[in-house]
Amino acid sequence: VNFNRQFASKGGLNGNSLTWQMADMIDGAGYQTDNHFNGLLDANNPYTESSFYDTPYLGAMGARTGLVDVDWDDKGNITKIYGWEGIDGEYYSRETGSINEYDFNVSFNVRDRFYFGATLGVYDIDYLRYSSYGENMQRLNGEYQGNFTLNNTYKTEGTGIDLKVGTIIRPFEYSPFRFGLAIHTPILYNMSDRYTSVLASNLPSDSHVQNLKDFLYGGQYTWDYRMITPWRFNVSVGTIVGGIMALDAEYEFENYSATKLQNAEGVELNGQSAVKETLKGVHSFRVGMETKVSSAFSVRAGYHFRSTPITSDAFKNIPVTDNTRTDAEYLNLKSRQAVSVGLGYRGRLVYADVAYKYDFYKGDFYAFDGGLDQSGNLLLSPTKVNNERHQLLFTIGVHF
């Protein structure tokens, strides 16, 4: 799996603003008096002091940079917590990294009709994302204007292990028809996340900066945990027609809502509830064909469909899943499809393959959670993402 990509989005906000999500975080943390709120503003380090553990980092950063304000009555009780009106916003991200898999397998067959195999898989994850979100905003119909920029750096590393077992059976001795069954155990990942953030605001009265490197040990937040993926089940069928055309089809199911998140001691994390509510079962279907057009050349074609793993109403709820995270953006993926065609050559000494692959999917991108109106409709319209990837693959080898 290759994570390398860049993404950019820009558009009007019609009054929606990330600052209101920050304000909701402060409200949800139970700030009820001016003394409580001013204590957050005056604290030496609200990101590590135990009295502020219930305050999400992003909410605290917004309050301490003037993006979140409060009104209170003559008794000091807070009557309103609010942000700014967003004019327009601009987002950019750059991602790098990959998941590498190393397989160790054994296999055997019985009478060339019953084939059995087992594979031990070892995985290595290395992922880095830098993102920047900037917003122009106003108050009182433009009488006061300002802007802010939120930069996030997120890195995760990990290793995992799983076991795959499967069988292929030719039920009829003189027929090329075959079917297969395979089961993949959950992948047990040991993960380590490291992230930091900088929020800078430019307001009519003054400017503020909150750099988490100045408050966190080692300059970043570090979190070690376990992720256990769901079981995966696979069935396949295949045959040969006329001695020259190979056909195969494959179906796979994986219930993403069964993914487990645990701390290093094996205790379930808060984000587990969000996994169950926002992820769902994924269905994958593949078909392929290869035909020999001569003794040396063959042509190939294939199609792959994969359903979306995310429910249509999913959103990123930072206070519930992990209140130390400051990257509010999220992407709700739709189904994914891929089409490929290829040509193969098999000579006495040299063999070669060339293939073209077209991979495409859609998604809804949100720079932040804008919430719902009274009718239950999203206040922030998503950015419609159309992702297309074209690949030309070439392989050449020599027989010894």
Task: Provide a role label for each language-model segment.
Residues 2-400:
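Outer-membrane beta-barrel porins/channels
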